[in-house]
Amino acid sequence: YDVRIQSVRWGSTPPNALEKDNPIHQEIDKRILRQPNLEKQPDLHLHIVIPNEFQPIAKVNVGMTAGIEHTIPPASWVEGCNRMDLNIFTSEFSRTSFQKIQFDKLDNKTKKVQGILKLEKPTDVLFEGADTNVYKETKEISEKLSQKFSKIKEDFCFLFVGHWLTGNLGEDRKDIGMMLKVFYTMFKNQKNPPALILKTSGAGFSIIDRNEMMKKINLVKDSMKDDKLPNVYLLHGDLSDEEMNQMYNHPKVKAHISFTHGEGFGRPMLEATFSGKPMIAPISTGQADFLNKEYTVQIPHQMTKVPASAFPKDYANPEAEWSTVNYGMAGKLMEDVYNNYDKYKLKAKKQMIVNRELFSHESMKQKLDEIISPLLANIPQPVELKLPSLKKEPKKLKLPKLKKG
């Protein structure tokens, strides 16, 4: 394939993901278009943006999206998907949300129903694979991480990784506030409690953002100020993929945890399972594709209405639902993992083995090829015509000159 890449903005995310010394990143960088111009119409366009921005510019157009983290995508997103020839979702949950929803089409003047808006184009699912060369069991810990973890006195820590987004207590998408409260409640007033590490941030890694994270932690902590509470540590700042893996594997990290309300896929949880340590989480939305119920410390959950504060107005819907864990059971499971850790270790190793086989970059590449190749096979290709060579002209007869008579 002759691949060209057009970089697109994603909110306030800085364009600093590519590392100059990384050979894979170098291959990406040299394919980025410096000017948004192409010499001809491309055969295939893979558009990886939010669906209302999908644009068909090629002979075959494929939209790729994680969808939205609740059950009702916006109508404009469904319209965007219908502009494409195929739509690829990152999980069965996100695909199902698009397939099930229908909207009434209203006349702008009369407001009468003119028809139904629904997803009409073909769909497929392509998971977000993890790099098995990076995410794996390791004992290697960088000096930077070693210094950070040296400040943690506990030898048993639960680790959460994810953004702390908007919303009141219990309403942020990752449900970090309630996870904190459950942790404090379950292990308060104990002599040797475990710790909780939050690798989190809001919009970035600034000092202002770090202070905002501390303010949120203290808001929950202060509501329980009469108790002796276990320690919660904030790990704030940018880590490389290798450092993220080292963090997952640090000997003080004994288990991964998430109360997430909704995921389009949940790749940080997938990458964390590659460390071979227990994962405590609901098997509910996007992560249900790779969290095996036999190997996960599964938190019971139910589908509940999404609070209005959790999403921007354009993405919210009063009928939308997401997952909410049973907080009482979640606390008991955390306590059991802490008190009976050995019984969970073998299952965690099995989950690691299964996920490394099924959800690697290589497996993702094979699945993408299975999806894309049939589409490309039907694209008309220019054919070079080979005309037959012409025979040489016969030699002209030289007639004798007539003598003048």
Language model features: what each stretch is:
Residues 86-144:
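Donor nucleotide-sugar binding/catalytic pocket of nucleotide-sugar-dependent glycosyltransferases
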Residues 340, 361-403:
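C-terminal alpha-helical cap of glycosyltransferases
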Residues 246-264, 274-277:
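Acidic donor-binding loop of glycosyltransferase active sites
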Residues 321-329, 339-370:
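A charged, aromatic-enriched C-terminal amphipathic alpha-helix characteristic of glycosyltransferases
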Residues 11-98:
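Extended catalytic core of nucleotide-activated donor transferases of GT-like folds
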Residues 278-281, 297-298:
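Short hydrophobic beta-strand element within catalytic cores of glycosyltransferases
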